[in-house]
Amino acid sequence: MNKSSFGSHFTVTTWGESHGKALGAVIDGCPAGLSLSEEDIQKFLDRRKPGQSRYTTARKEGDLVEILSGVFEGKTTGTPISLMVRNTDQRSRDYGNIAYSYRPGHADYTFDAKYGFRDYRGGGRSSGRETIGRVASGAVASKLLASLGISFCTYTKSIGPVSIENFSPEEINNNAFYMPDADAAAKAGTYLEKCMKNQDSAGGVIECRITGVPAGLGNPVFEKLDAMLSQAVMSIGAVKAVEIGDGIHVAHMNGSEDNDGFTIKDNMINKTSNHAGGIMGGISDGSEIILRAYVKPTPSISQPQQTVTSQGRQISLEIHGRHDPVIVPRAVVVVESMCALAITDALFANMTSRLDKIQKIYSK
């Protein structure tokens, strides 16, 4: 089965290719009555669209969203919401030299192995432009969650060897890298200039902090909340690893260091630390959820690379076209969107976890 849908209760299906006529998504399960406009969605899409700085692809796309269904007089109707963004600046001719070549770091070979056929123009469904549907849907989920007091703070934690040393939330939108540290952003720019001069690319780390999530979301076995979030974020093409809370560092800690203690504050149960990152036993504990996504370097580089063709010839390949030297800044909102979709789906699933919750919904 070709899986292009995410979620069980708040379901999103993305469609379209990088060089097709359009891309988009269909959302099924959004409740009626949510105030929603194209402007709400456009704010999210503008954070990932190309051409925002010299460190992103020169492809000029407005990425203007159209709501085709599911909204009437500014409110969601409870029926499927169809969202579309038209492609306007494709240059398929840039990909003529790779029609039969397997680009290192791309999905060309694996698509051929699976389907026996592939759309080589920009990678088709494996292109980063597929995330347009995710981001548009994530904007809807984020607005719904905001109405429930759940918010996100997502930013670039590092690019290549350059990591943030300070955290100023107001700085995130003041630089091209969405870094909460102006000094680190300047150093990242210098590092990327060297990468570009060497016809190379860079990766990095994105951190997402989610506040306001109530205790109780997720399940104890196969649909753990951390597993749902990890699946959501790992489904992003450039992401190679995800960690929650202290992540891989817990392997080097003692139990006395890793365990989060509990205390009572204002008649509420609180934790004295948050090494678990807001999730214990697969279930949210009410504290801030902290997730990090590790993003690989952009595989499209201009350096000659050794590869083979689908006919079995060994060749040296130079990739031309318009490509990002680093995808991390544009992926920040993609990570946030996928987290929003996962939290929304878990929230809806949790509405039937207890009889008293069902009785509260249907009380006369």
What spans do the regions from the language model cover?
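N-terminal, positively charged regions that mediate nucleic acid binding
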Residues: 1-59
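Glycine-rich anion/phosphate-binding loop at the beta-strand->alpha-helix junction
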Residues: 15, 21, 199-202, 206-314
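Glycine-rich, mobile lid/loop segments that gate access to catalytic sites or pores
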Residues: 113-221
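A short glycine/serine-rich beta->alpha loop
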Residues: 11-16, 119-130, 215-219, 274-279, ...
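Glycine-rich, N-terminal phosphate-binding loop and its surrounding beta-alpha-beta segment
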Residues: 44-104, 108
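Short acidic, glycine/tyrosine-flanked loop/strand segments centered on an H-E-D-like triad
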Residues: 99-124, 305-323
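Internal helix-turn-beta structural module
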Residues: 300-364
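Alpha-helical support elements that line or immediately flank enzyme active sites
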Residues: 21-33, 128-150, 223, 227-231, ...
